Regions:
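Structural core segment of the AMP-binding/adenylate-forming
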Residues: 10, 51, 78-157
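Conserved pre-ATP/AMP-binding loop-to-beta segment of ANL
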Residues: 20, 148-184, 191, 216-222
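Gly/Ser/Thr-rich phosphate-binding loop
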Residues: 271-274, 284-372
Length: 473
C-alpha cells in the first residue's frame, strides 16, 4: 500500500484549489463557496484557541446535516481536536451519555437538540454552541464567553487586510494512527461503544472512493447529503470524499421524506447517490410499483421482445425519479428488500450494494454496478482484506472478518470490547455471517452478534428493546 498522506492536508488543498467554487448549500438556502467555508473554519479556530481548546480535546456535534454542521466538523479536525459526531435522533439521555463518556469539552447543537438537552447532566462541558450561528447556548468559562463576544474583532486583528488562500495552514496529523473522531454505535449506556476512527481510515475510505468513482465525478459536480453525517456512511461518502474532490454538496436540513428527497433529486441532479435501502424502497414503492401493477403493463412485461422495451422505458423513468444524472446508486447500511432488488436488476438499473461497519469508517466490500452480483455486497474494497471464518466459505456461512487501514483503533475506554472485536492478527470480527464465492463476492447471511440493523442503517440492540419494554410494562 502507498504511503498514507495527511488527511487534513487533503482538506486544506481542496479549499485552496477550489477557493471560488461552490462548496456547501442547505437545500433551498444560501450557497457557501470554499473560501466561505475557510473563513468559518478560521473563526472557529480562533474561538477554540482563545477558549483553551487543546489538540486532542474532544468536541461533540449533534444536529441535523447542514453547512454550519459541516464547517464546525471541518474546523474541529483541522484544529487537531477530536470530533464526536452524535446522531440527532438520539434521546436527550443518550446525548448526555455520549458527551460524558467521550469527555467532550465543547458541544455543538442544532435547533431541536438545543431545546431537549439538560446541561446540568453534562457537568464537564465547558460550553454549548448553537450550530446555525455559533452563538453560545452555555458558557462555563470566561475565556469562551470573551472569545465568542470578540470573535469578529479577533478575526479582523489576525487578518487586518484580507483573508486569502495563503492564510490557510491547518494542523497536520502527526501519524496515520492519530485519532480523528469517535463515532458511537448506540446512545444507550451499556450498549454504546465509541469507535475510535484514526486519520488513516478517513484517508483509506476517501482513497477507495477516488479509485472507484474518481473518473466519474469531477470538480463542481452536485451531491446530495441525505444520510446523517454523524453516521460514518454519510460522513465518508456524502461529505468528506466529495469535499476533498471539490464537489458542491447540498444538505437536506429537514426530515428527508420521500417527497422532499424526490424534489431534491429533481433539482440538484446528483452525480452519485449514496443511500440506505429504506430511501430507495420508499421511492420505488411509491412512484414505480403502482404503475407496473396495471394489468396492461403486467401483460406487456411478460411478452417476449416487447418486455425488453418496456423494461428500458421503466428504467428511464426510475432513473429520472433520482435526478437522471447519476453514475450509480450505492446502497448500504442494512439489508435490501429482495423484491425491490429483483425489480431493479430486472430493469438493468444502475445500482450496487456495498457493505461496511462503523468500525471500518465504513467500507468493507463494494463492486461497481457493472460487476455487481445480485444478492451480494461486492468484493473486498481497495486496501481491505476480507475472509470468512468457515471450513467451507463458499457453502457454510461463517463470521465475516476484515483487515486493513479502514479498521478502527478500538473502542474508547473499553479495552475488553476492543479485544473481543479485533484479534491479535489485526482481523476485525464484524459479527455478521456470510459466504464468499470463488470470485470473492461476499453474501451476507445474518448476524452472529446480538444486534439488529434497521433499514435506515441504525443499530438496534434487542436488549435495549427489552429494557424499554420493561420500563413501560
Amino acid at each position: 500500500m502507498e504511503q498514507i498522506p495527511s488527511f487534513n492536508e487533503l482538506i486544506e488543498k481542496s479549499i485552496i484549489d477550489h477557493w471560488h467554487k461552490d462548496a456547501l448549500t442547505d437545500f433551498k438556502g444560501a450557497v457557501l463557496q470554499y473560501h466561505d467555508v475557510a473563513r468559518k473554519i478560521a473563526k472557529l479556530h480562533i474561538m477554540f484557541e482563545s477558549s483553551g481548546v487543546k489538540r486532542g480535546d474532544k468536541v461533540a456535534l449533534c444536529g441535523r446535516n447542514s453547512s454550519a454542521w459541516a464547517c464546525a466538523f471541518l474546523a474541529t479536525l483541522t484544529y487537531g481536536a477530536v470530533a464526536v459526531p452524535i446522531l440527532h435522533e438520539f434521546t436527550a439521555d443518550q446525548i448526555h451519555n455520549i458527551v460524558n463518556h467521550s469527555d467532550a469539552k465543547l458541544l455543538f447543537v442544532g435547533d431541536v437538540v438545543a431545546t431537549q438537552i439538560d446541561t446540568t447532566k453534562m457537568p464537564h462541558l465547558e460550553g454549548v454552541i448553537y450550530i446555525p450561528d455559533y452563538s453560545l447556548v452555555l458558557s462555563r468559562t470566561d475565556k469562551l464567553t470573551y472569545a465568542r463576544e470578540h470573535l469578529n474583532e479577533m478575526f479582523g486583528h489576525k487578518y487586518p487586510k484580507y483573508f486569502r488562500q495563503e492564510h490557510i495552514s491547518y494542523y497536520k496529523e502527526q501519524s496515520p494512527d492519530e485519532l480523528a473522531l469517535i463515532n458511537y454505535t448506540s446512545g444507550t449506556t451499556g450498549f454504546s461503544k465509541g469507535v475510535m476512527v484514526p486519520y488513516r481510515a478517513l484517508w483509506s475510505n476517501a482513497d477507495f472512493a477516488e479509485h472507484v468513482l474518481g473518473n466519474k465525478i469531477k470538480v463542481g459536480d452536485n451531491i446530495i447529503s441525505i444520510l446523517p453525517m454523524a453516521h460514518m456512511y454519510g460522513m465518508s461518502f456524502e461529505f468528506l470524499f466529495e469535499f476533498i474532490k471539490g464537489c458542491h454538496i447540498f444538505f437536506l436540513t429537514r426530515i428527508p421524506s420521500p417527497a422532499i428527497i424526490a424534489a431534491a433529486f429533481a433539482e440538484v441532479k446528483p452525480r452519485v447517490i449514496i443511500s440506505v435501502p429504506l430511501i430507495i424502497e420508499k421511492i420505488i414503492k411509491k412512484k414505480v410499483f403502482p404503475k407496473i401493477q396495471d394489468p396492461k403493463m403486467r401483460l406487456l412485461m411478460k411478452m417476449p421482445g416487447i418486455n425488453r422495451k418496456v423494461y428500458e422505458k421503466i428504467c428511464t423513468q426510475v432513473t429520472q425519479a433520482f435526478g437522471g444524472n447519476f453514475y450509480e446508486i450505492i446502497i448500504g447500511g442494512a439489508a435490501f428488500n429482495q423484491e425491490v432488488e429483483a425489480f431493479l436488476h430486472q430493469i438493468h438499473f444502475h445500482y450496487t450494494v456495498g457493505y461496511g461497519a462503523t468500525e471500518c469508517a465504513p467500507i468493507i466490500c463494494y463492486a461497481d454496478y457493472q460487476e455487481f452480483v445480485p444478492g451480494s455486497c461486492g468484493k473486498a474494497a481497495l486496501h481491505m482484506q476480507v475472509r470468512i471464518d468457515s471450513s467451507d466459505p463458499q457453502n457454510v456461512p461463517g463470521e465475516i472478518l476484515c483487515k486493513g487501514p479502514n479498521v478502527m483503533l478500538g473502542y474508547y475506554k473499553n479495552e475488553e470490547a476492543t479485544a473481543a472485536s479485533i484479534d491479535k492478527e489485526g482481523w476485525f470480527h464484524t459479527g455478521d455471517l456470510g459466504t464468499m464465492d470463488a470470485n470473492g463476492n461476499v453474501f451476507i447471511k445474518g448476524r452472529s452478534k446480538n444486534m439488529l440493523l434497521g433499514s435506515n442503517g441504525q443499530n438496534i440492540y434487542p436488549e435495549e428493546i427489552e429494557d424499554l419494554s420493561l420500563i413501560h410494562i
